[in-house]
From Swiss-Prot:
Protein name: Uncharacterized protein AF_1213
Top-level lineage group: Archaea
Length: 149
């Protein structure tokens, strides 16, 4: 229990004040940058649960490195698509916040990776992922964090 509280506090530090402020300004969108992080981590947990990834530190580092390589191209493409979407839909006032948040995704993911690697030495990897997913879902659903129009 104490480990979970520490893990949650460390996760809260990853999402610092400026980032939270920008996520709040973006509001509820169909494809929020926070959702991308959540879905990435759900895919990782699914791979662990289905035996595609062994829950060892080496395997986890390998999957994190592969995600980083893949994410660079994906994020670049997403930025272009989202930029054109924002321009067409008159949502340009939040474009800067959206792009800022997207650009921070790999930094956020790297910090979460390190937390997972540290935490999995003391707690099962499944428990770590469940706590992480619960935290991300809470952030996505927090009415004080994200506006619901």
């Amino acid at each position: 229990m104490a480990g979970q509280l520490t893990f949650k506090r460390e996760l809260e530090k990853v999402f610092e004040k400026e980032l939270k402020k920008r996520i709040e300004r973006i509001g509820k969108t169909p494809l929020s940058p926070l959702s991308l992080i959540l879905f990435t981590r759900i895919a990782e947990l699914s791979a662990i649960e289905n035996g595609y990834i062994r829950p060892t530190e080496y395997e986890m580092r390998e999957i994190f490195a592969a995600r980083t390589t893949y994410s660079e191209g994906l994020l670049s493409t997403l930025k272009d698509i989202i930029y054109s979407h924002f321009l067409r839909s008159n949502l340009g006032e939040h474009l800067e916040d959206f792009i800022y948040t997207l650009q921070r995704i790999e930094d956020i993911q790297s910090k979460i990776d390190e937390l997972i690697l540290r935490e999995m030495r003391e707690v099962s990897l499944r428990k770590v992922y469940h706590e992480l997913l619960r935290f991300l879902l809470d952030m996505l659903c927090d009415k004080d964090m994200v506006r619901f129009d």
